[in-house]
């Protein structure tokens, strides 16, 4: 994907080498190495510069990204996409349940990556798939994908630093009590399986989930959940640990009476735009299969 990013150098940034300035903006060392290999990728006031050269307050720095390769082994497939937002740097998708993020052995042609490969192929744009918040196949809702190497690196760092704020909605069995709280229960891989996780206070990694009851209906609760950590299956295990498992969860509560997938939805997401710094906020409504469980 091609992108020209422009920066106005401030007094505080006066005297920095270009590579120092870009590292402060969140570009990785690998990003800088790739940009160096691109022809005339750094311009200052319209003149070609090298990464080691210094900047002066008032300079206009342009970073010209030109990616010509596409993700290998991701065949383009025409699959509808619910696009919530798109600009030159990111695309935000409301992913349906049942769609994997990446192709895999049994899901080679039905992933989000396949759909986006097709979407950009139609526009004659090379596309490398860089998903910044990965959802389980049967979890619906918001996910953000970067469109070039710089936004990808910056968003990845923001995610690691817990600067991407997410709210999930879940439908669980029973009336949740207390109605709000924080679950601090470390998680580890369950012995004998590569998929399942479990609460393990001795060997597990720190996992913290904040929850709040929204409504209760028909013997089920709709719960809002926010994560401080992003462990595999964290919400699913923590709610089961609390005594209120997600309905339809084939791994941790295999009761398919009301739903045939875990009732979990990535509902809301907020973060600073990786390039402009503008605060971004997105919401995806509760999907019908979850809403129907709560109807009288």
Task: Describe each region flagged by the PLM.
Residues 1-36, 81, 201-208, 215-218, ...:
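Pseudouridine synthases involved in rRNA/tRNA modification
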Residues 181-186, 197-198, 209, 223-225, ...:
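Beta-strand scaffold of nucleotide-dependent catalytic cores
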Residues 91, 168, 221-223, 265-267:
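Short beta-strand micro-motifs in enzyme catalytic cores
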Residues 99-102, 195-196, 221:
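Short small-residue beta-strand/loop micro-motif enriched in glycine and branched aliphatics
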Residues 176, 217-221:
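Catalytic strand-loop-helix junctions within cyclic-nucleotide turnover domains
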Residues 194-202:
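Short aromatic-glycine motifs in intrinsically disordered, low-complexity regions
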